[in-house]
Amino acid sequence: MSGSKSVSPPGYAAQKTAAPAPRGGPEHRSAWGEADSRANGYPHAPGGSARGSTKKPGGAVTPQQQQRLASRWRSDDDDDPPLSGDDPLAGGFGFSFRSKSAWQERGGDDCGRGSRRQRRGAASGGSTRAPPAGGGGGSAAAAASAGGTEVRPRSVEVGLEERRGKGRAADELEAGAVEGGEGSGDGGSSADSGSGAGPGAVLSLGACCLALLQIFRSKKFPSDKLERLYQRYFFRLNQSSLTMLMAVLVLVCLVMLAFHAARPPLQLPYLAVLAAAVGVILIMAVLCNRAAFHQDHMGLACYALIAVVLAVQVVGLLLPQPRSASEGIWWTVFFIYTIYTLLPVRMRAAVLSGVLLSALHLAIALRTNAQDQFLLKQLVSNVLIFSCTNIVGVCTHYPAEVSQRQAFQETRECIQARLHSQRENQQQERLLLSVLPRHVAMEMKADINAKQEDMMFHKIYIQKHDNVSILFADIEGFTSLASQCTAQELVMTLNELFARFDKLAAENHCLRIKILGDCYYCVSGLPEARADHAHCCVEMGMDMIEAISLVREVTGVNVNMRVGIHSGRVHCGVLGLRKWQFDVWSNDVTLANHMEAGGKAGRIHITKATLNYLNGDYEVEPGCGGERNAYLKEHSIETFLILRCTQKRKEEKAMIAKMNRQRTNSIGHNPPHWGAERPFYNHLGGNQVSKEMKRMGFEDPKDKNAQESANPEDEVDEFLGRAIDARSIDRLRSEHVRKFLLTFREPDLEKKYSKQVDDRFGAYVACASLVFLFICFVQITIVPHSIFMLSFYLTCSLLLTLVVFVSVIYSCVKLFPSPLQTLSRKIVRSKMNSTLVGVFTITLVFLAAFVNMFTCNSRDLLGCLAQEHNISASQVNACHVAESAVNYSLGDEQGFCGSPWPNCNFPEYFTYSVLLSLLACSVFLQISCIGKLVLMLAIELIYVLIVEVPGVTLFDNADLLVTANAIDFFNNGTSQCPEHATKVALKVVTPIIISVFVLALYLHAQQVESTARLDFLWKLQATEEKEEMEELQAYNRRLLHNILPKDVAAHFLARERRNDELYYQSCECVAVMFASIANFSEFYVELEANNEGVECLRLLNEIIADFDEIISEDRFRQLEKIKTIGSTYMAASGLNDSTYDKVGKTHIKALADFAMKLMDQMKYINEHSFNNFQMKIGLNIGPVVAGVIGARKPQYDIWGNTVNVASRMDSTGVPDRIQVTTDMYQVLAANTYQLECRGVVKVKGKGEMMTYFLNGGPPLS
């Protein structure tokens, strides 16, 4: 076994651990004192707070948090970044927490250590390296080759890979369900790639068809539960959208009623249907906003609303007079578009509704206007208008739904990552707090976050406690037990036994400090003071003796416990910078250790001080410890042996035992176990072992942690469901978003939102260009042709083609030259540039909608008819058109009244084209709602001015001709003229129609932007919480890696471990070093002048910190610090695949170089601290067993004969010399190291051994 049980100075019977001393000099900018912008071993934006992010009122995000969002903590599933020679993290914690040496003045640094620090400072001040882009995707071999990055053992890696694989599979399954169209054309592109085409080659026709079909596929998530969560996520927003749609539908119905009321006689069926539609919609609006309305009712409400719209459509087209194929186009377009945009239905339902509304209008127009000679032109134009409206609806609905599903998916992924980090963080916290008491761990983490003032010495984490009891226990006869077991069986035996001791310590209110070989020691009264600390230690000792007696019965080996207890004062805490372990120091600790050494097997040996705290509750007899231990005799310590409890104490213990049994029975009892591998199994039958182990109180291996068995996906969904139910959209909107402008109240938040890139901008431009084409076709169909029309449309087409081409390059950037790529990126990635391009595109579309009006005949038909009939213009009506000698009709394109300009008899199609241009405006989702409103109002103002001033005669003429056409149809050749054949003037209808559209489109734009901003905000808050959790996790991980090796920490964080679960590895060739300060015990004294010994410990902390800085250098990355024991420093190399060099033996040479470096450093320390410390170092190589004893309170260590001999090389060594064994000599001599033979040395347990002194490294060539 390891010789680490030795105690070097008075009060140093225990192992030391490392403490951080965060320092913040000018060259140490980060919270950990690093010179570069790294935090917790991962890239961190400089200038950001190292603390967890602090939220401003209203949940706004600070600039530091935004920086942290830009450089996120890597998840624990990712492999560690490769460590290189200039990386301060190489080989472990290579940090200097002070700005200058404790051994020199605050001036220059002219020693070897100073130059080393300068080199490391220069390295750390270099450019910050980001983690590998692949995250955890790299191979272990690649990671191992990258500068000595450690690789987990295969046994650990398999479990982690399985867990990662499950997580990735779930993520991919969900990510694939976000949208069907985002990856459209994959099948075709992959097929083409096989034909030798380059990246982004021409897509096949099949791929294009698949891309189009993808749009109409269901976007449902594969999981019904996830789909319901998505519906719940957007339920309030959909409810608001549905209410808004009902309001605008009521407005449209009222406008239709007003138009009908303005042209008598009134038709009761028409009025009844529209009034009923308004009533039904209002009732539905009330029901939809009741508390009882939930997402299951949403579908019914949507389809009911579609039915109402269809009824209004049919009645609105069949009943009004005068008839016209252009009648009702504006509300049909309105109905179609609002179903796509404001009605929360699936794409296929929206498409079917739009097509059905279009078909109804076309069918009714064909039936009621079958005798019109010009009907074909109108029907073709109507088909183009409805087709364009449906396409624009699809182009609006599809990206909106995809964006919503992506926002939901990304938010869920943030929550999933946060919960994953939270689970791992809880495991880390549990593991961390099992090794370090809470107050020490919290102080360390606080110092990590806080910027420390520059100090000469590292901060030391030590507290003084005056009234405690210290228990040391050693297994007597352990050598005999060890001789009957292999090294692995011995480790398992110790693991099971000490796991039981840990459980007993918890029951008896004792804190286990450390395990040193077969020695176990604990303290009662830490960290919280207890008046009965002496009683707790005595009861702990009794339980330990009882537990070892069961081992004796099971194994048949004569083993026993020797227990020593002393009460007094201790200093507790950690020392150094690496491999922290909580420890205690003081002369009283030294005395307690000697009480164990001078005790008797199976008895509890106590001092007079402890007896005074027991208050006569135990019967004792004189211990005569001085007869068995020289230290006790030298210091005249009066000792006693516990005989038994008094009757009063027995009654108290019986009451406590009864309460424990009742608690156990209420929970249920499970069969105990020894673990999967039982070193004592062959000695007795299974039943007998079970019986004995039952008496020892081991747990059932079948017990599983409830959290482990829970499905993480269900946990994420449940958490998300609670968050959805808890969030208030109105509160979020009022707290963070301005009501009218819809901008964030926090400027930083608005800036971050504005920097979002919409990858679909090219699609928006393409859709607007498609609207332009439809408008062109409508105008060509319905308006007389002219050279101006042709030239204007060709010019606009070329401009739009260029804009589309440049915008689309962003999506397939690799196919085009670099200047075009740069131009496309500048347009798409800049909100201002993309908005300007969008406005330019919309302007061209708008111009195409009405510019042909200026080529039409503007003569007033009323004036011509008044002149012909010799009446005033106010007396002219439609009957005069029918009675005119001139054939004025809608089919006549020759100019009226002798005008050379052609007649445009259907000017309402200009209005419908303008409506399409307004729809094109709504396609650009990246333009703000206020921007769209300003743009649409400008379009409306310009067009209405044109209609009301220069184009008013055009619309008045059309009104006369439509009414006259209806009179001809109804008279059917008779001479009667119905005076009631009237029509609301187009110049009145047009501004109202456009205003209704502008209002509806603005409400839709506001809804879209509001949804996008709330999604952004919720995702940002979820990301922020995830970042805070990951930041805390990174701190904990950093602390853990200073306690356990990374591969070991990963093993224990993989899942909850049982108290007696074992982790170990067999290592075939490990170099082991023990380095002790031989005369430190002479230096350590407890005086009031040195704060009862604290200042001595402060100096020891500096020495250990210097050793830790040296082992952190890249050239020593193969080394692993094991622990410190008092003033003894223990390290080893070759403990895993990445550090073991079977051929070159570089790990052995690295340890020899490290030993020589420690000698040089000690000389430097002596020179600058005016001391004369003498070091003895022992080295050995051979096989060891590395593992962790106590899964719940893990302590990493190595065991085996190799370790014992290395310890003996130290203890039998000579001050200021490095003693090595023959095996070590052979390796070093073969590599031309300078050694000399010391001769034969007597070694305890080994007899005589030939040893050598290491004098220096290979001669320089």
UniProtKB/Swiss-Prot annotation:
According to its UniProt entry, the function of this protein is described as: Catalyzes the formation of the signaling molecule cAMP in response to G-protein signaling. Mediates signaling downstream of ADRB1. Regulates the increase of free cytosolic Ca(2+) in response to increased blood glucose levels and contributes to the regulation of Ca(2+)-dependent insulin secretion.
Residues with the Phosphoserine modification? S96, S155, S666, S754
The UniProt activity regulation field reads: Activated by G(s) G alpha protein GNAS. Inhibited by G(i) G alpha protein GNAI1. Activity is further increased by interaction with the G-protein beta and gamma subunit complex formed by GNB1 and GNG2. Activated by forskolin. Is not activated by calmodulin. Inhibited by adenosine and ATP analogs. Inhibited by calcium ions, already at micromolar concentrations. Phosphorylation by RAF1 results in its activation.
User: Can you say what this protein is called?
Assistant: Adenylate cyclase type 5
Instruction: Return the similarity comment.
Output: Belongs to the adenylyl cyclase class-4/guanylyl cyclase family.
Q: Where in the cell is it found?
A: Cell membrane; Cell projection, Cilium
Look at the named UniProt entry and state the broad enzyme category this protein falls under.
lyase
**Assembly behavior:** Interacts with GNAS, GNB1 and GNG2. Part of a complex containing AKAP5, ADCY6, PDE4C and PKD2. Interacts with RAF1.
Gene encoding the protein = ADCY5
Task: Kindly list the organism's lineage.
Answer: Eukaryota, Metazoa, Chordata, Craniata, Vertebrata
